Structure formats: C-alpha cells, structure tokens
Amino acid sequence: QEQTREFQKENETLKIQRFENTFFNMLSQFQEVVNNISYSYQDKEIDKIVSIRGREAFYVSFEMAPRRPGISSWNPEYENRPYQGMSEVISVLGKEVYMDAFTPSYFDHYFRLLYRILKFVKTSPLIAEFDAEYEYTSMLRAILSRYELVWIYYNGLSEYGEEKLQPLLERYAM
C-alpha cells in the first residue's frame, strides 16, 4: 500500500511537470512573439518613418501612431481626420470603433497565442483546482505591460474576442 501511494504521488508530480513544461514553453514562445512584433509609421514632425519593436509597439500604436479610422458609417467629419493613436480614436468615437479603426494585424498572432495559453490552463486535466489555474495565469499576467493589458481589454470586448477570449480574461481577472 505504501508503494502504491508513492507511485501515485510520483505520477502526480510527473503530470504537474508535464503541464509546467508545456506552460513555460508557451510563455517563452509568447515572449518571442512580443519581441518580434514590429510596427512602422510615418512621423510627420520629423518627416521620417519610425520603426518600433517589441513591447514598445503596444504603447506607440495606442498613444502615438497616427491613425485614420476609415469608418464609412460614422460622421464624415471624423472619417478623414487623423488621430493620435488608438486612444484618441476610442476617446472621440467610442470603444465600438475598435474593430473598424485599423485594428493592428501585427497583434493577431499575439492575441491568438494569449488565448491558447489561457485555454490550455483552463482545459488541462492536469490542473484540477481553480486556485492552481489562477496561479499560472497570474504568472502570465505579471509579464504583461500596461499597454498590452489595454490592447487585451479592447480586443476582449471586440467581436474578435468577446465570445472566447473575454470569458477567460474575466475568469482570471486580467
């Protein structure tokens, strides 16, 4: 009986190690995706194309990069006006415009991988308790910058994320 108990304990340890190996590999891949994000835009003040990489792309594209929403259903007065970053587009036109306002496709892979990590934690049979799920997703949340969280928030509210991503974001208080 003692031997059976030891075997079960060892088996549980191996399951957790297998889960953690996959989870931390996914986090590593996520970090690689973040580091490889690149974004370029024309800065009219210095008359130069500015290229941004990594986490800085989240900040620049939200606060600084010029945007033209191109939303035909909106008031034409706003249609062709340049905006200073997605934050200004949202503050002038509302969060509903996120989908139409040139949502950056260079974040697509980022959002898909984020979703896969959260879904992996939620659906893994190797983790039985919510507290353990929450602990792992807290590790993920800890590596996200403020502007990543802002983009994740709006993506979760959009038609891209409302059905699948948003429930996971709420579940893990992200």
Task: Go through the PLM ranges and name each one.
Residues 1-15:
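Membrane-aqueous junction of the first/signal-anchor transmembrane helix
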Residues 12-174:
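Intrinsically disordered, low-complexity polar regions and short flexible loop motifs
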